[in-house]
Design a protein with these regions (language model features):
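An alpha-helical, amphipathic repeat domain used for nucleic-acid recognition
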Residues: 1-206
């Protein structure tokens, strides 16, 4: 491979581009160590050595650093590693390492997420959130069976009552506003309409 570009990233780091496509993020001192400069011919064996001896360990360290701050799904952590400039193989190595110790576990993440947010989000909204985080439908279904969640109707009622405090339910436009708010949070139209009607009755009885 040929070094086609050396791009400064920070005061200490650079991105080294090979053949206009493959890149590695290295410290500036490592450029001299491995004799990397624009136009240099680099054997594939050297790139493999850099990845195996330096970058894979560095990727593991970075992944551990991220996980000390918060939990991540496999997709989220992979995206973080790739965004930081690690190659697919380095990211895969880091994921395998942290997963082997149970530091990243999509099933556990999904259960925790459902239990944490069930008092403020609908099941539909939480399912959408988890899909965006890269968790499969099958795993979400398993998590729903295992998680100890708040009753969704109670969550809906709590949402509706809180929102209704800022509305005048004697006005049709405010009733529609409440209904749209609840549906927008992922609750079904039927359930949202029922609880809205119940709150209107309570409001009229005052």
């Amino acid at each position: 491979m040929v070094v086609t570009a050396v791009i400064p990233l920070t005061a200490k780091k650079v991105k080294v581009e090979f053949d206009h496509q493959f890149t590695l993020v290295l410290y500036k001192g490592e450029l001299n160590l491995f004799h990397l400069k624009e136009g240099a011919q680099v054997p594939d064996e050297l790139i493999t050595e850099i990845e195996n001896k330096i970058l894979k360990k560095r990727a593991v360290k970075y992944a551990m650093h991220l996980l000390q701050k918060k939990d991540y799904t496999v997709k989220e952590l992979t995206d973080k590693l790739l965004h930081a400039g690690y190659s697919d193989s380095c990211a895969e190595h880091a994921l395998e390492y942290v997963a082997s110790y149970g530091y990243v576990n999509d099933k556990y993440y999904a259960v925790r997420y459902l239990e944490t947010y069930s008092d403020r989000k609908s099941i539909k909204k939480m399912q959408m959130d988890l899909r965006q985080k890269g968790i499969s439908d099958e795993m979400i279904t398993q998590a729903l069976e295992e998680a100890e969640m708040e009753n969704e109707q109670d969550t809906l009622r709590c949402f509706a009552e809180k929102k209704a405090r800022s509305l005048d339910l004697s006005q049709e436009k405010d009733r529609q506003k409440l209904l749209r708010f609840l549906v927008g949070r992922g609750f079904s139209y039927t359930d949202a309409k029922n609880v809205t009607d119940e709150l209107v009755i309570v409001h009229n009885e005052r």
